[in-house]
Amino acid sequence: MGIGTAPSALIAHGIETTAVEIDPVVHEFATRYFNLPLNHTSIIGDAVNMVDEMHTGFPKKTYDYIIHDVFTGGAEPIDLFTQEFLNGLSNLISPGGTIAINYAGDLLLPSAISVITTVLSVFPNCRLFREVPIPVPMGKEDFTNLVIFCKNTTETFTFRIPNEADFLGSPARRQHLVPQNEILDARQTVEGKGRIIRRGQTRWLEASQLRSARGHWHVMRAVLPDIVWETW
């Protein structure tokens, strides 16, 4: 959840919103200090258990939009990227609905390639967008923020041109709302390079996660001056 930017935007657009957060303090701080509106359903708990439980309910609740946005950058909760968990989310999407999956990592590492491979194994129709263009020439690292939009249908989908109301007065939304830097032919790009991530079989990812965490740290060091990190 972080500070609640995404759920706040959904609520502002009149979308009935359910927010899932494992840490009650994160939800409390988002509400108290970052103005997360109260008119939403909050579920405090493990998303893996929550998704499993939602499939046992009757009638099963489905969602038009699902945002899968957890901290990654080498410390990702890998259980939230397993084929089993993503299958569970797929079954919660309403007909014609969409899921957006945010992942930050080094796209040259097996962990990132395997996350993409696993997502594409579940959803038949995905479009992938990088935060920054592919570096030229390619170096030893390719750390970027990645958003994967997927649907359960096979029809081509596009993004409409945003209007002023979509930005909610935010310069950041104005700059980033329209997806850019699409990775074309993503299935062909990762084919044969990654493994399907399965529940209970994730130990092999640990080395890649450590390298990705180092890459994320180097990126964060460029966000603020050294003195800030040294003081912190």
Residue ranges of model-derived segments:
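The AdoMet/dcAdoMet-binding core of the Class I SAM-like
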Residues: 1-100, 107-116, 120, 141
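E1/E1-like adenylate-forming module used to activate ubiquitin-like modifiers
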Residues: 103-106, 130
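Soluble small-group transferase modules, centered on the S-adenosyl donor enzyme superfamily
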Residues: 125-232
